[in-house]
């Protein structure tokens, strides 16, 4: 989440097809800005709505945040994808993830994520099924 100099991006532009970033602060705003600055497609390579500063032992991957972020990124014509960070098995060492130690899904959050993905899928099918 450290700033990157525009000079670095400008130097790389002739050699790249897509800009790919991690962003745990404001990915919707930042990816929109990078797309507008460069004209390049952007990919949210790693992000999550985890409350990192929470005192809770387990920190769920926030399904509502995911759904809101996915919908907002979908409105960015330059955004080509979103990779969720922390979609691992939750255990006592790695205290976040979409599956618990017995591989049971965090249904509350997974269901919200699934519904968001299905909404985008329906839009894609309608838009491109000609």
Where are the regions that the model predicts?
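Aromatic-rich peripheral "rim/lid" segments of glycoside hydrolase catalytic domains that contact
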Residues: 15, 85-130
């Amino acid at each position: 989440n450290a700033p990157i100099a525009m000079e670095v991006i400008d130097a790389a532009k002739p050699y790249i097809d897509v800009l790919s970033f991690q962003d745990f602060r404001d990915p919707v705003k930042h990816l929109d800005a990078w797309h507008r600055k460069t004209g390049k497609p952007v990919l949210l390579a790693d992000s999550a709505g985890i409350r990192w500063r929470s005192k809770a032992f387990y920190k769920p991957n926030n399904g509502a945040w995911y759904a809101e972020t996915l919908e907002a990124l979908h409105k960015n014509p330059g955004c080509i994808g979103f990779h969720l960070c922390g979609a691992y098995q939750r255990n006592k060492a790695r205290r976040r993830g979409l599956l618990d130690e017995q591989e049971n899904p965090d249904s509350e959050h997974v269901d919200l994520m699934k519904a968001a993905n299905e909404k985008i899928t329906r839009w894609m099918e309608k838009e491109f099924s000609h």
